[in-house]
Structure formats: C-alpha cells, structure tokens
C-alpha cells in the first residue's frame, strides 16, 4: 500500500483522544502511507483544512466524525474550484453515523481507514438548500427534527441512536404536526406532517429508514411524509408495511419546494435550519466519494 497517494484526515475534536484510531494511523504510516491529521474545534475549521489539503496535493480528504463532520467536509469539497479536487473518505466516529452505515462503511476503524484511502472513488450527488446550505444524507423536519436536536448529549453518548427513540417517547405529549405545502416534479401535497424526510441517503436519527429507496447517484431526492393527528398512532403505524400504511406519502424529484405559514425546522445532517420557505435541489455527481464495491446506495 506504500504507493498510495497521501491523504488528509479531518478529525472531529471529540474523537481526538481515540487511542484505537491513533494505532490504526500509526500502522498505516509504518507501511509507508502518508496521512496528515488535522483536528476541528469550531465551525469553519473543516473548510480551512480542505484548502490546506489541496495545497498539499492529497488525493483524499477523510472526514472523521459523525454525519455533521461528513457534511462539513463534503460541503467544503463541492465549493472547491479547479480540475484536481480530492475525493471524500469517511471514517465513522459519531453517535449515529447514519450515512456511513447506510453506504456500507466498515465499523472497524482500521478497515474504514483503508477504504477511505484506497477505495474506489465514485461520483455521488449532494443536496443543496436555498442555494447555500448542503446535506449529503438527509433533511428531516417535524417530530424527528425536534427529537434529534433536543436529545441530551449525555444520553446520545450512553445509548447512541437508541437515545433518539427514548427521548422521542418522553416528549410525545408536547409535539404537534407541522402544517406545510410541498411541491416537486409531478408532486404536490399539503397538510399536517408529523415527520418529513427528504433523502439523498436512506436513514436518519440513529438508523430510522425514512427514505428506503434513496440512491446517492441517481440525480433524485426521495421524499417521505408521515401524516396523522397524533404522534403515538403514527409511530405505531410505521411498523406496518408501507403499502398498508395510510399515514405514509412518498415522492421522488430532483427538487422540492416547501412552504409553511410558520417557522419549521429542518435538520440537515445534524445541523438545524429554520424558516418558512425551503428550496431543496439535488446536485448530481457533485463530488467523488470512496465507497465499498457493494455499496447498496448505488444504482
């Protein structure tokens, strides 16, 4: 593996003391592989490190963290200009790791690191909101957004993705649906939504398959709306097969426009964005990502 080009790992500061990761990096360095490591501590660090990665001429920028870290690195990469832009590698180190899990990134850090450096770089889509903010995995609105943004950090650290479900059950009596109107290509719906999922990827909230048909290189966004007047019946209904569920509405489009009479909040790969009007569009083949050969999200 010594003939592989250099990589730069952008590591979320929360994982800076990960001894297992240090050992994996040292083993690869002993094999002659050049890996630069930079640690983020505040917003904007990832973009600066991507600029540095281009100056160093590395072939891959590896995002080491959860969905938010992957989002920040991917967003910085698609904003790069020029012909030679590094590929994105993924090292899952977050609470839920929804995107990494759904695309088949290995859980073992040494295997994930080798894939991030030596895996095949494949062009994938990314989504953009209101011409500025991006998400690589999913935008969630309604009940799901409030749960993921309000779940205490200590609960997430202790229980991982299960913490979202537990906190959701605790908050069920205070959550109400969002009234909104959604338009897309050959799609129009308006009403009260308990949960809205707009996916480039398939899952969010610690493993919840909100958009089970999503692919990351088909030029489309998948939409799933959970409707209903009460939270508990809607949650119970999600256990039914989709074709039997009257509370599920699906759509697919290269773009969706969402309007609401009041502020609603979308969670974009872990980052909240509030407003009354959202234009969400897919950017086809926006970046290259090193993925396993059997990645289930590729067409």
UniProtKB/Swiss-Prot annotation:
One term under GO cellular component: plasma membrane
SUPFAM superfamilies xrefs: NAD kinase/diacylglycerol kinase-like (SSF111331)
Record's keyword terms, sorted: ATP-binding, Cytoplasm, Kinase, Lipid biosynthesis, Lipid metabolism, Magnesium, Metal-binding, Nucleotide-binding, Phospholipid biosynthesis, Phospholipid metabolism, Transferase
Cofactor: Mg(2+); Ca(2+)
Localization of this protein: Cytoplasm
Residues annotated to bind Mg(2+): 215, 218, 220
Predominant location: cytoplasm
HAMAP family: YegS
Function comment: Probably phosphorylates lipids; the in vivo substrate is unknown.
Family listed: Belongs to the diacylglycerol/lipid kinase family. YegS lipid kinase subfamily.
Entry protein name: Probable lipid kinase YegS
Organism phylogeny: Bacteria, Pseudomonadati, Pseudomonadota, Gammaproteobacteria, Enterobacterales
